[in-house]
Swiss-Prot record:
This is Rhamnulokinase. Its EC number is 2.7.1.5. Belongs to the rhamnulokinase family. Its cofactor is Mg(2+). It comes from Escherichia coli O139:H28 (strain E24377A / ETEC).
Amino acid sequence: MTFRNCVAVDLGASSGRVMLARYERECRSLTLREIHRFKNGLHSQNGYVTWNVDSLESAIRLGLNKVCEEGIRIDSIGIDTWGVDFVLLDQQGQRVGLPVAYRDSRSNGLMAQAQQQLGKRDIYQRSGIQFLPFNTLYQLRALTEQQPELIPHIAHALLMPDYFSYRLTGKMNWEYTNATTTQLVNINSDDWDESLLAWSGANKAWFGRPTHPGNVIGHWICPQGNEIPVVAVASHDTASAVIASPLNGSRAAYLSSGTWSLMGFESQTPFTNDTALAANITNEGGAEGRYRVLKNIMGLWLLQRVLQERQINDLPALIAATQALPACRFIINPNDDRFINPEAMCSEIQAACRETAQPIPESDAELARCIFDSLALLYADVLHELAQLRGEDFSQLHIVGGGCQNTLLNQLCADACGIRVIAGPVEASTLGNIGIQLMTLDELNNVDDFRQVVSTTANLTTFTPNPDSEIAHYVAQIHSTRQTKELCA
């Protein structure tokens, strides 16, 4: 038997994990084992919302050392994280300024300023990326405007996964899939756009040319002295999750469900027409030159904040209580900017319902019901937008990531979208990370080959839409009202 041992470091906004994958070549089987799981979260530091990158690095090294202490020979390591955030370094590789998080308010108002000065259409034609107020483009503008004293000290700007790879190897890399989330990469050249960089105030010399997934960045020397290659995987966690989505045919859509919900489809070409711009669709980079045509949805961040504020520890019990409540009594727009990082999420949700003359969700279950119903309805709207954009309906939706364990939300999604939902794998980002490593090690041919492995080894659950459910009737009523308004217009 020939085995490969690959380690995936998967960092999310609320937690991180070091996972060991064992791949058996002869039977093409892949097993995962969690080595170390640790918390991540936002911190307040000197008036900014930041990440504790030192703590994250320590946790990564602890997890890697645990694998080595077991006497396991690691064949490769890969790191994926969330997008848009970065770390600045000086000529000696020391940090400059703070690792500010995208939920900080420093970039407020700058997106509108960019659209006015550069033109919304021009920015979109250059980058193909959706407009979000915390994109790196606006974060860099905030930094260079508000902290100009830092600029003379900056030599390099590394996105989060590239920073941690640098800390392990001493080598710098700018991985393509994550670089595209910045809204600074030109969609035609796959290189940094000089006009957008100039507006941001950043120096192009801070960045190296983006590289597509699959190259070896450098080597980490383990405590035993072995040199272990660190691979540039699809380092944006959603890009990795999509790689591990067992998409079957061109009519399959995906939903990467976690702190954020990312809904989209794969395409060989980007969509940057007026319809895509109006719908704020993004064309993020994927593996093998594919595009992840998708839309960001605020996701389970709202629930995470409610759980924290209400000190709820028993999520299954909450979901059971939520399921017993009637649907669609409290509806909000999860993508409203007011929910990016409010002081109190529960109060913000209640205020949104109050302002629209709805009943007010008071109990834990009512707040959860509001979030789940609102997300499912938004999923249905976005799926419809995506189908219109490409001119073809979808036949199935693959929900991957930690959020796919929420069976109530999966069923609500199936009912609201009127589409078959396949849930799993849960550890999609980790698996996609491993997939690129195995391709780099010449164990697998390509993404489609890897998806066959995932399909046969992952635990997948199918949810069939129920046209008689409350939320399905609610969606039908909305569509009927819209059609009536269009006829009367």
